[in-house]
Structure formats: structure tokens, C-alpha cells
Amino acid sequence: MDYAKESLRLHGEWKGKIEVVTRVPAENKDDLSLAYTPGVAQPCLEIQKDVNKSYDLTRRWNMCLVVTDGSAILGLGNIGPEAGMPVMEGKCALFKAFGDVDAFPLCIKSNDVDEIVNTIYLISGSFGGVNLEDISAPRCFEIEKKLKEKCDIPIFHD
């Protein structure tokens, strides 16, 4: 098989490897009122009282962020964040296919350690974990260290 040719065809045909789907019914007014407003206010208030309830009342417990800056993509090197997106989508697809983990790609347009750390930290409340992917050394280790100090969720780098 010509993997380069077939992969390009697959990516063009499917226009991405992952998607977001609803887990709750959205068929009628009552469904929508439970999933969104006004019903959604009650889970919000419970989480406000105890932030850890976000793991019980939302999908956060099963959501992982897969992050790159595009600086060390597989054997391709520094190809930029947009060009790294197919790899991040692929990693997210692996998380779902083999671990049933909902993973989301984040391709950051910065090579600055503190900008990357701050960006991830600011959105970390939406995720149960962070996977640092294809960020060049030694910055990847510094980013991992700083995030572990700042965030209260698992941070790993492979």
C-alpha cells in the first residue's frame, strides 16, 4: 500500500479524524431544557460549591487535551502548529479507539514556554488531563515541569 497517497486521500475525504457528538437526547423541548437552560443551572451551582463535582456532572473526567506547538512533529521536525494538526487528530483518535478517552487537539501558535504553559493552564479546568505531544526538547521538559507545578490535573509527555 502507498501509505502517503492513501493517507492523503483519507484525510481529504473525511476532512478530519475526530468529531464531537452529544451523549444526551436532544429531541424535544424537555431534552433541551435539561441539557441546557434552564435545567443546566443546577449542575452549575453544584460545581460552584465543589469544583470536584465537575468530574461527576460533566465529561471532564474523560477528556484529555493533546497539545503541540508543531516544533517536533514525528520525523518531520518544526513544521508548525497547523501542519501538526493531522498528528494531533491521530493521537486523539488513538485515545478514543484504544482507551475510550475523549481527546481534543490543541495546536498552539507559540514556541514560548510561558505562553504555552499559560494557555494550557487557563483552559485546564475543562479537562481531566493533558498530553504534551511533539514539542521540541528541552522546552517540552520545562513545559511539563511548570504545568505539573501549576495544574491540578495529570500532565504527561511522551
What are these regions (language model features)?
Residues 1-151:
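N-terminal ligand-binding/catalytic initiation module
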Residues 156-158:
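Active-site nucleophile and cofactor-binding loops and adjacent substrate-binding regions
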